Amino acid sequence: MVYENPDGIRIGLEIHVQLNKLKTKMFCGCSTDYHNAAPNTHTCPVCLGLPGALPVLNKKAVEAAIKVGLALEGEIAEETQFHRKNYFYPDLPKGFQVTQYDYPIVSKGKVVIEGEDGEHVVGITRAHMEEDPGKLVHIGSIEKSKGVLIDYNRSGMPLIETVTEPDMRSPKEARRFLDKFRNILEYLDVFDGNLEGAMRVDANVSVHWGTRVEVKNISSHKGVERALLYEIMRQKNVIRRGGKITQETRHFDEGRGVTISMRTKEEAEDYRYFREPDLMPMRVTGWIPAIKETLPELPDAKRARFMEQYGITDMHARALTSKIMLADFYEGVCAKGVDPKVAATWTADVLLGELNYRDLAISSYDGRTIGFIHAKDPEVENSFKVSDMVELVTLFAEGKVSDRAAVEVIRTILDGNEEKSPSQIIEEKGLFKAEDDLVTRAVAETIAENEAAVQDYLGGTEKSLNFLVGQVMKKTKGTADAKTARELIVKELKG
């Protein structure tokens, strides 16, 4: 099926990614580890823009940019150079930003996503290096603030800005692109997406193939999707009333879920770009072969290998490779000799599902334990051991625990009981699978006590069977196997 795109929606993204895995900033020796530091303590004359301070390029940042370009299947420039982008704003103490203009380090890449009609290619126009400005802290909301504080700890942080073609046709495709793009960056180990401000997105969107509007500085993938949904609705309403869309820059108010006009959209000439005289042009083609050798197995290749090596479904392979540390955890479990298909089910469906429900983000994996932090409160930490998943998968495969009991074990561990093994939890909670005679007795009692549901089922109401199974599970405190309970009920009622 071909997606017709009835509203003529075109979405392009500009993604600003901090290379926060590097030790020092883009053009000076200040540490990039500033997130728990007091304001304006990770600064120097270079990142404060003091007169006479000269930049020194961080070679590791260039290598990271090349690595990103190769992973995006882009062309690496034979020669690249920096420019000054001139504008006056409090977060930019020099009065200009050191960036790249007509000689970006990467061009003509692509990312393949799951689109509205199957696989969909999103073109990468360019990816270029630049420095991050400082951070403005508004007192109150951005609209009503009576004062602004400035923290220059972020000033000079190494950034890669990646610009896509307007190839996305819905907010859902835009979010899927961001998920895939972030996944690639995490596999490359160039940034930590759990840190504040690690990725910021500007979204350009138009409807009916018309004038585009830019929505600036969105900090989450969900926020991008929400902002685009609102902005598309707003533009369609303007056109429906006979109005015209103005090319402008808007801000997304996360709390209210609306976009707010900030200013008319600037053109490139408004920034008066000119070459940075304090940094020489670079020829980097000689670096490429060595950097290419360091590229890891990327998400698509790992997904294909998981399906072939472990015999798991495409859905499970996609979920498991959506985070590199989750993929490593799964392989750690499989290395212990358990059934990889059962391990995939419990890791991708249950463990990952619980993490999403609890708003926990994967933060570490050391070969033995996978760690999590709460997305909104990094002080909340949790973990899950490889050995615990191996034990749980083994108990389930041997028929010693039901699926409901296994889910209860995972939830109990994530509730802060990492020190207890699955067997201990099962013993304490009485979760070992019920004996057949106990299940048979529970089935008989359930049928006797629920005559109305029995008659509904016999009359063709299939959902009544689910109710009866639930009653059996309740009587056995979740220790019965749901499939066995269902089969026994059907056999008892229909012979």
From Swiss-Prot:
InterPro entries to which the protein is assigned, alphabetical: Asn/Gln-tRNA_amidoTrfase_suB/E, Asn/Gln-tRNA_Trfase_suB/E_cat, Asn/Gln_amidotransferase, Asn/Gln_tRNA_amidoTrase-B-like, GatB, GatB_C_1, GatB_Yqey_C_2, Gln-tRNA_amidoTrfase_suB_CS
SUPFAM superfamilies, alphabetized: GatB/YqeY motif (SSF89095), Glutamine synthetase/guanido kinase (SSF55931)
Alphabetized GO MF terms: asparaginyl-tRNA synthase (glutamine-hydrolyzing) activity; ATP binding; glutaminyl-tRNA synthase (glutamine-hydrolyzing) activity
Keyword entries, A-Z: ATP-binding, Ligase, Nucleotide-binding, Protein biosynthesis
One Pfam family hit: GatB_Yqey
Catalytic reaction(s) noted: L-glutamyl-tRNA(Gln) + L-glutamine + ATP + H2O = L-glutaminyl-tRNA(Gln) + L-glutamate + ADP + phosphate + H(+); L-aspartyl-tRNA(Asn) + L-glutamine + ATP + H2O = L-asparaginyl-tRNA(Asn) + L-glutamate + ADP + phosphate + 2 H(+)
A GO BP annotation: glutaminyl-tRNAGln biosynthesis via transamidation
NCBIfam families named in the record: gatB, PRK05477.1-2, PRK05477.1-4
UniProt cross-references to HAMAP family, sorted A to Z: GatB
Chain's role: Allows the formation of correctly charged Asn-tRNA(Asn) or Gln-tRNA(Gln) through the transamidation of misacylated Asp-tRNA(Asn) or Glu-tRNA(Gln) in organisms which lack either or both of asparaginyl-tRNA or glutaminyl-tRNA synthetases. The reaction takes place in the presence of glutamine and ATP through an activated phospho-Asp-tRNA(Asn) or phospho-Glu-tRNA(Gln).
Protein name: Aspartyl/glutamyl-tRNA(Asn/Gln) amidotransferase subunit B
Organism: Methanosarcina mazei (strain ATCC BAA-159 / DSM 3647 / Goe1 / Go1 / JCM 11833 / OCM 88) (Methanosarcina frisia)
Gene for this chain: gatB
